[in-house]
């Protein structure tokens, strides 16, 4: 049987999250969006860098995610770029997250936005904040990898 083509594609990544947090678990959540937001996502007018997820009354909300409206947005709708977006997940997953987030030091951060079967999805992670020395270790590790790649590249020439 033929394999179905991969219809998912990345809209935006939160690269700063990997620098600031250790990821424990990853989850995928749906997004409740307005029409102008979907159009802006298709154009890639989104910023996740300062985003975070809160749990309020047993529901998940994405805060700090900027979806900038297109210049051609409708005139009868006043778009709010910093609007709080509701995330959709199963109740049992949300209950599990509530228990883990209540532990000291854990938070929920958005990792990326992507399309899956024509719908916008947000990948979120249960994360623990890195200390300053951990961030320095991450930088050293990244620079070490770059140096190895540079040496290997020069050897192959």
From Swiss-Prot:
Q: Where in the cell is it found?
A: Cytoplasm
Identify the GO cellular component terms for this protein: cytosol
Q: What Pfam families is this protein classified in?
A: SmpB (PF01668)
The coiled-coil segments of this chain are none
Instruction: Note the SUPFAM superfamilies from the entry.
Output: Small protein B (SmpB)
Q: Which GO terms describe its biological process?
A: trans-translation
| PROSITE patterns documented for this protein | SSRP
What keywords appear on the UniProt entry? Cytoplasm, RNA-binding
Query: Could you tell me which residues belong to the region Disordered?
Result: 130-157
Q: Which GO terms describe its molecular function?
A: RNA binding
Q: Could you tell me which PANTHER family the record lists for this protein?
A: SSRA-BINDING PROTEIN, TMRNA-BINDING COMPONENT OF TRANS-TRANSLATION TAGGING COMPLEX
Among HAMAP family, the record links this protein to:
SmpB (MF_00023)
Known function: Required for rescue of stalled ribosomes mediated by trans-translation. Binds to transfer-messenger RNA (tmRNA), required for stable association of tmRNA with ribosomes. tmRNA and SmpB together mimic tRNA shape, replacing the anticodon stem-loop with SmpB. tmRNA is encoded by the ssrA gene; the 2 termini fold to resemble tRNA(Ala) and it encodes a 'tag peptide', a short internal open reading frame. During trans-translation Ala-aminoacylated tmRNA acts like a tRNA, entering the A-site of stalled ribosomes, displacing the stalled mRNA.
Regarding protein family, the annotation reads:
Belongs to the SmpB family.
Protein name per the record = SsrA-binding protein
Instruction: From the UniProt record, report the name of the gene that encodes this protein.
Output: smpB
């Amino acid at each position: 049987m033929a394999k179905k083509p991969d219809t998912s594609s990345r809209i935006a990544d939160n690269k700063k999250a990997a620098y600031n947090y250790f990821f424990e678990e990853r989850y995928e959540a749906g997004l409740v969006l307005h029409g102008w937001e979907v159009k802006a996502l298709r154009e890639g007018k989104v910023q996740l860098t300062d985003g975070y997820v809160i749990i309020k009354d047993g529901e998940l909300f994405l805060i700090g995610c900027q979806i900038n409206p297109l210049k051609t947005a409708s005139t009868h709708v006043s778009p709010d770029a910093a609007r709080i977006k509701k995330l959709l997940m199963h109740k049992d997953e949300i209950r599990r997250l509530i228990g883990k987030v209540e532990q000291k030091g854990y938070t929920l951060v958005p990792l990326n936005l992507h399309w899956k079967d024509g719908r916008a999805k947000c990948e979120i992670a249960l994360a623990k904040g890195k200390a300053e020395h951990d961030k320095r270790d991450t930088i050293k590790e990244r620079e070490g990898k770059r140096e190895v790649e540079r040496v290997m590249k020069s050897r192959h020439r």
